[in-house]
Amino acid sequence: MNATSLLQLMWLASPALPIGGFSYSEGLEAAVDTARVATEEEASEWLLDQLDLSLTRSDLAVLAQSMPAWQCGDTARISQLNAWVLQTRESNELRAQTEQMGRSLLEWLRNHTTATAEQIELLANLQPTYPLAFALAASATQAPLRDCLLAYAFGWAENMVQAAIKSVPLGQSAGQRILQALAAQIPCAVDHALTLPDDARQAFSPMLAILSARHEVQYSRLFRS
């Protein structure tokens, strides 16, 4: 991967990208509120499980399949995968998150010459989800597929660690230890996601869905619903 591709990929994965990823806790704040997560160890275990059981089998698997579809212009496949993401968000909050981040990344793409006008128009007509928007942006970097999945997963990890720091709450050193644990597991998660066919892709995480739904009506919260 050349320097330009690497820097573009780092840009896409950066929490500074104005798409709002830092404003969601994906059920973690509700887990804290219900005393399921109260310590550094519990936060680390929670996020490692979420990486393994949720992100790997859903978003990372979709990303692995949608990047080649963008690169070869397979509009039917792109539409199918985008619809799958929408259908498998099990709470209003989780669906609103992927739609808002997808729209925000679409607007970012409109202002950068990283995708063609035809690709952007196709995405805009799909009620874009974040994984499909990221796949389009990442495919334009010409970075290898595996590296794009690594960047996506690490960007997710950074946002979720910040959510843990604010909601548990934890110190910065504790957050860095959790991030280190997540970073150690991300390569294996990505390699697994790359092997998943359509019938093995899933987003069945009932407790995460329940907590996300509870967070929608939680009395006091830091993160967006």
Swiss-Prot record:
GO terms for cellular component: cytoplasm. This is Urease accessory protein UreF. Disulfide bonds: none annotated. UreD, UreF and UreG form a complex that acts as a GTP-hydrolysis-dependent molecular chaperone, activating the urease apoprotein by helping to assemble the nickel containing metallocenter of UreC. The UreE protein probably delivers the nickel. Belongs to the UreF family. The gene is ureF. It comes from the Bacteria. InterPro entries: UreF, UreF_sf. One of its GO terms (molecular function) is nickel cation binding.
